[in-house]
Structures are given as C-alpha cells and as structure tokens.
C-alpha cells in the first residue's frame, strides 16, 4: 500500500461512491489496509446479539472503512476539496499546505 495522505482528525470530503460530496472528520486511519473511517460516511446497519458489553442487543449503526483514495482533504478557507504539498519551514518543521490557496493544515 502507498502512504495515506490524510491523518486522524482531518476534515475530508468524499469524492466518489454512494456518499459522494459528504464532508466529515477522519476518526481513524488503517494504513495496512489503505482505508480510513470517516464520521457519518459509509454507515452500515449491524444486527447485534446481546452480549456482556451490550446486554440490550438490537440494530446498531456504525461507520465502515472506505478506501483512502476516495477522500480528499477539505480546506476551510477555500471551501473545497484540495490537494496538498509539504513544505519545510526555516525552523525545520514540516507543514502541509493547500495547493489552491496556500493555507497550512
């Protein structure tokens, strides 16, 4: 798998699939599978049996992973999906920069 371009707590927009256009926060990144879990995106219904943790059981809704290639970083300043570039500042810190407007993430 190639390196995943988003990190936990990034705001992303889905660019393809049934949830195209939805904006959400990355809850977790699965680098070995090349997938990410985004809040309120790709929500699946699961029928849960009662167990020790969940005595009630029933139908639960949870986010399922989607491929990282289906999401792009969302820039709040541009209000659109954008590609990013990496830049090293004078003090040696590495920052991610929006290719459209130059805003740092």
Swiss-Prot record:
The organism's place on the tree of life at top rank: Bacteria
One GO molecular-function entry: structural constituent of ribosome
Keyword rRNA-binding: yes
Parts of the chain that traverse the membrane: none
Gene Ontology cellular-component terms listed: ribonucleoprotein complex; ribosome
Alphabetical keyword list: Ribonucleoprotein, Ribosomal protein, RNA-binding, rRNA-binding
Matching SUPFAM superfamilies: Translation proteins SH3-like domain
GO biological process: translation
InterPro entries (alphabetical): KOW, Rib_uL2_dom2, Ribosomal_uL24, Ribosomal_uL24_KOW, Translation_prot_SH3-like_sf
Pfam families reported for this sequence: KOW (PF00467), ribosomal_L24 (PF17136)
Family: Belongs to the universal ribosomal protein uL24 family.
NCBIfam families, per the entry: rplX_bact
Subunit description: Part of the 50S ribosomal subunit.
Function: One of two assembly initiator proteins, it binds directly to the 5'-end of the 23S rRNA, where it nucleates assembly of the 50S subunit.
Name used for this protein in its record: Large ribosomal subunit protein uL24
Lineage: Bacteria, Bacillati, Bacillota, Clostridia, Eubacteriales
Encoding gene, per UniProt annotation: rplX
